UniProtKB/Swiss-Prot annotation:
This is Tudor domain-containing protein 7. Component of specific cytoplasmic RNA granules involved in post-transcriptional regulation of specific genes: probably acts by binding to specific mRNAs and regulating their translation. Required for lens transparency during lens development, by regulating translation of genes such as CRYBB3 and HSPB1 in the developing lens. Also required during spermatogenesis. InterPro entries: LOTUS-like (IPR041966), OST-HTH/LOTUS_dom (IPR025605), SNase_OB-fold_sf (IPR035437), TDRD7_LOTUS_3 (IPR037978), Tudor (IPR002999), Tudor_domain_containing (IPR050621), Tudor_TDRD7_rpt2 (IPR047448), Tudor_TDRD7_rpt3 (IPR047449). It is found in: Cytoplasm. Coiled coil: none annotated. CDD domains: LOTUS_1_TDRD7, LOTUS_2_TDRD7, LOTUS_3_TDRD7, Tudor_TDRD7_rpt1, Tudor_TDRD7_rpt2, Tudor_TDRD7_rpt3. GO terms for molecular function: mRNA binding. Residues 126-147, 859-880 are annotated as: Disordered. Keywords: Cytoplasm, Differentiation, Phosphoprotein, Repeat, RNA-binding, Spermatogenesis. Residues 513-573, 706-763 form the Tudor domain. Belongs to the TDRD7 family. The gene is TDRD7. One of its GO terms (cellular component) is P granule. It comes from Ailuropoda melanoleuca.
Length: 1101
């Protein structure tokens, strides 16, 4: 029993360190890494680990995802709640490791588009890399006894396919190439191939002959520079490899390197990199052992010898780049635009981070600068290409989006200049400077550089990185730390090295004198070594308010005896503590109440962050992802400081008149406006804003250029301006908003929103929402959707009626809802003629299977009686039924003539067998079944999805007699999709198949609407596919997950083998080879990878 208690406590400790849970297969490993032992579930009497976990629900919460993956989460415990809180809030030197946190905004992961950005060019075809660097596919070593490299049948020859080559905007002729399915990319090129002259020139550069032992033929491998887009990633990999080699001074086998790399950085090392080490003398030294084996030894680079040879020669400064020649303008080319005009266009576009339609540029330009827009500018968009990026939609010059050009980083400018002058010169110069620094360091281990420059902190590129909030003085300067392998994990590694260096180096002594700005290594509590910076000093101590731990963002009093000079080698990592600005709170950034609320909600806690603007102090939105739903911290803080005196405080048993019902939801929930001080002040402000906009010319500064969830702005509806809060951003054009003062939710265009004028902003955002959420008392709650007829009758009876009355029976503070009796003007204050009683006494409800409303029970009390209700006059039920019938006849119109169920779009275009096709994989079950979309058509689907959201959000809900195997529009997760109805369930749900994304979903039948003809033009984008080149009768769950991880939600190149046509576009099928060409130096053929995996799996089994 004691052992069981110990195991459960240790298990809880393991799970609590993983905020987003631990997958069941990883749980044993995580447990052992903490305790040194496995979970002894068999000794505890359970046949499996899962059975044991399910037996301790007080410790573990188990969830199963759609894919069947089981994840374990820690359950809350009163014993450890206080400890968890203290750990989260601590600001001591204790480190928080990156792998303890993995915050991701779930709401952001469900976006059906914008996963990879809008495709602006074709994907690199296998065999030809970006910038024409030749790809090198690793030669696998499995199954050589079967005559090929990857277990694919030797006679599986592919028909000739077309290879498209492109340089700049010039497209060369198609080059036919015959290849074997397992051929390495090195073997795809031959000097005899009929390539265009520019391409032949490129291939004829210095080539190194290389024998392919796989196909026994000579290939040519040009030595070319990797593209600029790959430089950053390669530099990161090289630095990591140097770190590994520095820890293994006696050498390391090259075959063992991937294992060490993955163990240290939790990331796979690309196999193609292993073949490039001999070309990286500045990173490592490669040695082939005398034993003659295939494995190689790697050593740290021999830099000192190279240094001497460099320093012996005279240092010649590089000559300046030649000035570009002034060429006369070519005949027929349009004249260049004036410089000041281009500057103004660039300044204007900078305000539109999501781009601006070219057709909207003249008006925005004239609104902003009050000068006439040049007439010929739109006809000559190419002349603006030096100040903006032009994205032509579908190649149509009349439809283009203009984006502001971001300034190039310094290293990119240097790289471009170096390439113009010569790659060799710039490489020599950088190597010389780097080696000079190393030589200076090597001369004396005690030499410290006082003015060492620490590189700036790079903002993470991932969609929603995790941050730890440290402290804040105002919401425009919130101190945070990024959590992740390149941030907190790298910092951990550095601090371990600092501890080893300062603890074991007797020559290192404490500083004798200190000065402002000096960087120090501080021996903090618990024997941790941290970096700190001095701003001011006082006698023998360093003033607390001016000594900051640069990686943690807080200050501390320390003795000089604990301060040491910081070795320059610990200055390569950026300071980890940085600042951010909370979006939407700028106008109240210094408000003491707001600062107090933000501090109480955020300090010491980890959040997912959405970065809106990348700047020195980035603009962000924080999300708490610890609960079932993601909580917008910015919006929560803004609501918390609303003026409570302007709220409508409802009192139990009180009667309120002149109440206006503003919204009725499909579950019977109502939103009401009750006369109060806040409503009067809001109406006055909105009238002033109306007058302000009427008198002032509407310029571009009032257009919303940066929408984000939680932002409060204005929307013009029914002749007046209303407050709305953005609740969901679908795309750069469409988003969902909620009217704060009516409770209505709808989808609108971004261009229809306006910023609140600055003079009214502070006043209007502190007024609480004036829509009060209510429900009808004595009616069953939590029954789901009401019947359409009842909702229609209720809306027709009370919606937007300004003189209704209510009596409050209960206020549920936790749910934020009031239980009321609702009266129309004619029936007030008769309790037996309330809306509540009329609904519960109607026979119409009894004919609905999905609604369970019955006559009011004898125990239910009326507003004026405690012993039950008096019978309603006999004709009231008949009158109600008659009013329902009239409302339905008036509200429901037969739209069947507007929608033809027979009209279907043409089938989506697929490449012919043997040709390439750029595809995107939205869904992957296993190699035998996955779904592809044409990559080049995704932007068209994106536009269609936006239009559907806007169309159906304002369309009247129609009652559809659905039929199986027919095409409809259905709302799935706040978005409208084109679907095929697969089945009708008895519980009010229907099974649908998304025709553009290939997913099967269950939706409420009320969310199914006719598909308008305007949305039947674009071909259905989802095509069922099967992977060629590999066969397996039954794919295991493990193999399926491996396949999904490599292809799902990724753009790939497909080589079409077979197209199986069908009369129904959703029944078409294609058999393809898939190639991942995202890396410039490697083609990953998915069927080869899966073949290797099956072989390895068979060996294990």
């Amino acid at each position: 029993m004691l052992e069981a208690d110990l195991v459960s406590k240790m298990l809880r400790a393991v799970l609590q360190s993983h905020k987003n849970g631990i997958a069941l297969p990883r749980l044993q490993g995580e447990y052992r890494s903490l305790t040194g032992d496995w979970i002894p579930f068999k000794q505890l009497g359970y046949p499996t680990l899962e059975a044991y976990l399910r037996s301790v629900p007080a410790v573990v919460r188990i969830e199963t995802s759609r894919s069947g993956e089981i994840t374990c989460y820690a359950m809350a415990c009163t014993e450890t709640a206080r400890i968890a809180q203290l750990v989260a809030r601590q600001r001591s030197s204790k480190r928080k490791t990156g792998r303890q946190v993995n915050c991701q905004m779930r709401v952001k992961k469900t976006m059906p588009f914008f996963l990879e950005g809008k495709p602006k060019a074709t994907l690199r075809q296998p065999g030809i890399s970006s910038d024409f660097s030749i790809n090198k596919k690793p030669n696998p070593t499995l199954l050589r006894d079967r005559g090929n490299s990857l277990g694919v049948k030797s006679d599986a020859e592919m028909p000739p396919y077309t290879l498209h080559t492109t340089i700049g905007s010039q497209v060369f002729k198609d080059v036919p190439v015959q290849r074997h399915v397992t051929m390495s990319t090195n073997n795809r090129f031959s000097p005899k191939a009929s390539l265009p002259p520019p391409f032949q020139m490129h291939l004829s550069r210095t080539c190194a002959k290389e024998m392919s032992d796989n196909l026994n033929q000579t290939v040519e491998k040009p030595n070319v520079t990797p593209p600029a887009s790959y430089t950053y990633k390669m530099d990161e990999v090289q630095n990591r490899i140097k770190e590994i080699l520095n820890k293994h001074n006696n050498g390391i086998w090259i075959s063992k390197l991937p294992h060490f790399y993955k163990e240290l950085y939790k990331e796979e090392l690309n196999q193609g990199i292993l073949q490039q080490f001999e070309h990286w003398p500045h990173i490592c030294t490669v040695e082939k052992p005398c034993s003659g084996g295939q494995d190689l030894l790697l050593y740290p680079a021999k830099r000192k010898q190279l240094l001497r040879s460099e320093l012996d020669g005279e240092k010649v400064p590089p000559s300046p780049l030649p000035a570009p020649k002034q060429l006369p303008p070519l005949k027929g080319c349009p004249a260049a635009m004036p410089g000041d005009f281009k500057e103004k266009v660039a300044e204007l576009l900078a305000k539109y981070s999501s781009g601006l339609w070219a057709s909207a540029l003249p008006k925005a330009f004239e609104d902003m600068y009050k000068v006439k827009f040049p007439e010929d500018a739109l006809k000559n968009l190419a002349s603006l290409s030096d100040v903006c990026t032009i994205d032509y939609i579908s190649g149509n010059p009349q439809k283009a989006i203009l984006y502001a050009k971001l300034p190039l980083p310094a290293d990119k400018i240097l790289k471009d200049a170096g390439q113009a002058h010569g790659d060799y010169d710039i490489k020599s110069m950088i190597e010389q400077e780097y080696l000079q620094i190393e030589e200076n360091i090597s001369k004396s281990a005690d030499t410290f550089v006082e003015n060492t420059t620490v590189p700036p902190l790079i903002i993470p590129t991932e969609a929603s990185p995790s941050v730890l909030v440290v402290e804040l003085s105002n919401t425009n300067e919130v101190v945070i730390r990024y959590v992740g392998k390149d941030y907190s994990a790298a910092q951990e590694l550095m601090e371990d090295e600092m501890k080893e260096y300062y603890s074991k180096n007797p020559k290192v002594m404490p500083v004798q004198t200190v000065h402002i700005g000096q960087l120090l290594a501080v021996n903090a509590e618990e024997d941790a070594w941290l970096r700190a910076q001095i701003i001011s000093t006082e006698e023998n101590k360093i003033k607390a308010s001016t000594v900051c731990y640069v990686d943690y963002g807080f200050s501390e009093n320390i003795e000089k005896s604990k301060a040491y000079k910081l070795n320059p080698k610990f200055c390569s990592l950026s300071f980890q503590a940085t600042k951010c600005k909370l979006a939407g709170l700028e106008v109240l950034s210094d408000d003491p109440d707001l600062v107090k609320v933000v501090e109480s909600l955020t300090c010491g806690k980890i959040f997912a962050v959405e970065i809106l603007e990348k700047a020195d102090i980035p603009l962000v939105v924080l999300y708490d992802t610890s609960g079932e739903d993601d909580v917008n911290i910015n919006a929560t803080c803004l609501k918390a400081i609303c003026d409570k005196s302007l709220e409508a405080h409802l009192q139990i048993d009180a009667m309120y008149t002149n109440v206006r019902v503003t919204n009725i939801c499909s579950d019977g929930t109502l939103y009401c406006q009750v006369p109060c001080k806040g409503l009067n002040k809001l109406n006055d402000l909105l009238h002033k804003i109306e007058d302000y906009f009427h008198c002032k010319h509407m310029t571009s500064e009032y257009f919303v250029s940066l929408p984000f969830c939680g932002k409060v702005c204005l929307f013009h509806c029914k002749g007046k301006w209303l407050r709305v809060e953005i609740t969901n951003v679908h795309s750069s054009r469409a988003l969902d908003v909620q009217f704060l003062d009516s409770g209505t939710v709808t989808s609108v265009k971004v261009s229809e929103l306006r910023e609140i004028p600055p003079r009214f902003l502070q006043e209007i955002i502190v007024i609480p929402p004036q829509a009060i959420k209510c429900c009808l008392a004595d009616l069953p709650q939590s029954i789901g959707m009401w019947t359409p007829d009842a909702v229609l009758w209720l809306r027709d009876s009370v919606l937007n009626c300004s003189d209704c009355s209510i009596k409050v029976t209960k206020v549920d503070e936790t749910r934020g809802i009031a239980h009321i009796y609702l009266f129309t003007p004619k029936n007030f204050p008769d309790p037996h003629r309330s809306i509540n009683r009329q609904i519960t006494n109607a026979d119409l409800w009894k004919h609905q299977k999905d609604v369970f409303l019955s006559a009011i029970s004898s125990a239910a009390s009326s507003p004026n009686s405690k012993s039950g209700g008096t019978p309603i006059p006999g004709n009231s039920g008949e009158n109600f039924r008659k009013s329902i019938t009239d409302a339905i006849k008036k509200s429901v119109v037969d739209h069947s003539s507007s929608f033809s169920m027979q009209e279907l779009p043409p089938p989506v275009h697929l490449s012919k067998p043997g040709e390439h096709m750029d595809v995107y994989v939205p869904v992957a079950c296993h190699p035998g079944y996955f779904v592809i979309q044409p990559w080049q058509e995704i932007h068209k689907l994106e536009v269609l999805m936006e239009e559907m959201i806007l169309y159906y959000s304002v369309s009247e809900e129609r009652h559809v007699a659905v039929e199986k195997d027919q095409v409809y529009a259905a709302k799935v997760e706040n978005k409208w999709h084109r679907v095929l109805l697969k089945g009708i369930l008895t519980n009010g749900l229907v099974s649908v198949y998304e025709l553009d994304y290939g997913k099967h979903e269950l939706v409420n039948i009320r969310k199914v609407q006719p598909l308008a003809d305007v949305f039947r033009k674009l071909p259905f984008q989802a095509v069922t596919a099967q992977l060629a080149g590999v066969k397996c009768n039954q794919w295991s769950e493990e193999a399926s997950m491996v396949f999904r991880n490599h292809v799902e939600k990724k753009p790939l190149v497909a080589l079409v083998q077979t197209v199986i046509e069908n009369a129904n576009p959703w029944d078409r099928k294609v058999v393809v080879y898939l190639v991942d060409t995202s890396l410039p130096d490697t083609d990953i053929w998915i069927h080869d990878f899966m073949s290797e995996y099956l072989v390895e799996l068979s060996k294990v089994n």
